[in-house]
Amino acid sequence: MTYEIQASVREAQGTGASRRLRREGQIPGILYGEGQEPVAIAVDHKTVFYALEKESFHTALIKLSLNGETKDVIVRDFQMHPFRREVQHIDFQAVKADQLVRIRVPLHIVNAENSQAVKLQGGRVSLLNTSVEVVALPANIPAFLDLDCAEVVAGDILHLSDIKLPEGVESVSLKRNENLAVATVTGKKR
């Protein structure tokens, strides 16, 4: 899915200026990237708030329009208000199509309900990590990774090597020879 966001350069900075922006329905943010100076920006709160609720937005390549120029960016960080449903600040990183990007991708459990551990042993599959750090070209970043649990039995521990990574995507930990546990299977052993 492609997301497009309109941004404007903000001149005034600081706490007071940020509060005024938020009252006007804008979010203060920053755009940075390799080979460019950081730019203080403002984006529409409603657009970003509802986009952040979608899991795919966090790993998507976003078209950010700034002063008539469109840049490819990814969301690098954002801050939420402690108790209001309000985005306080957002960071965008400009990316180039030919440069690798390091990003955390959500992990989904699939086929667990068909596994022996769940069907016959009354068990369940529990994620130890909800995301995996990967390196990929911006166009190859997946929205999420699937952890296939069709063949698991009670007592199994699933590792990074059990995840089928799409072509052009590499796990940062596996590149360092660290095959971390990502999920456990509980239930009654027979």
UniProtKB/Swiss-Prot annotation:
Pfam families: Ribosomal_L25p, Ribosomal_TL5_C. GO terms for molecular function: 5S rRNA binding; structural constituent of ribosome. CDD domains: Ribosomal_L25_TL5_CTC. SUPFAM superfamilies: Ribosomal protein L25-like. Keywords: Ribonucleoprotein, Ribosomal protein, RNA-binding, rRNA-binding. InterPro entries: Rbsml_bL25/Gln-tRNA_synth_N, Ribosomal_bL25/Gln-tRNA_synth, Ribosomal_bL25_b-dom, Ribosomal_bL25_C, Ribosomal_bL25_long, Ribosomal_bL25_short, Ribosomal_L25_dom, Ribosomal_uL5_bac-type. One of its GO terms (biological process) is translation. It comes from the Bacteria. GO terms for cellular component: cytosolic large ribosomal subunit. This is one of the proteins that binds to the 5S RNA in the ribosome where it forms part of the central protuberance. Belongs to the bacterial ribosomal protein bL25 family. CTC subfamily. Part of the 50S ribosomal subunit; part of the 5S rRNA/L5/L18/L25 subcomplex. Contacts the 5S rRNA. Binds to the 5S rRNA independently of L5 and L18. NCBIfam families: bL25_bact_ctc, PRK05618.1-2, PRK05618.1-5, PRK05943.1. This is Large ribosomal subunit protein bL25. It comes from Neisseria meningitidis serogroup B (strain ATCC BAA-335 / MC58).
